[in-house]
Amino acid sequence: MSSIRFIACLYLISIFGNCHEDPYYQPFDKLNITLDIYTYEDLVPYTVDNDLPNPNDDTTSFVKIYFKNFWITVMTKWCAPFIDTVSVYTSHDNLNIQFYSRDEYDTQSEDKICTIDVKARCKHLTKREVTVQKEAYRYSLSSDLSCFDSIDLDIDLIETNSTDTTVLKSYELMLPKRAKSIHN
């Protein structure tokens, strides 16, 4: 049976250039990731550790933000655009963090599957970790929610050219999972 799959894959490669057409592919060249967190923990001070791509590993980048009692990690893998800018906004019990790409990057290649993994971890764990995912596990949000009331994650895949910027696709992930409201 595996030899039949191998021959079928070779046939698809000769026609399409790869073994399968990717139903989730978007030709984006910029990322915009927004994280809204509601928490009772201290939001200042914080430190940001931004690991831009390096010549030894151009497939993965991550940003880690440390607060007193929790930390947030955003990791991208096989994404053409990298997170090169981070903006942090705080008020009372709300934390808004924007991770995005401002520099010019190549368009996402169809033969590379970009994944974005966002984790929010509390220093003192009192609950089990929960994970939500979208688009065949490409985009994920996970947290133990021990020190957070809720977490909302928005991911925008953006295409730019000399005259226009277009959001090709947006994804929303929430913890705890809850139903969206319906507006008439």
Swiss-Prot record:
Signal peptide: 1-21
Entry annotated with the keyword Signal: yes
Keyword vocabulary terms for this entry: Early protein, Signal
Protein's UniProt keywords contain Signal: yes
Stated family: Belongs to the poxviridae C8 protein family.
Name this protein carries in UniProt: Protein C8
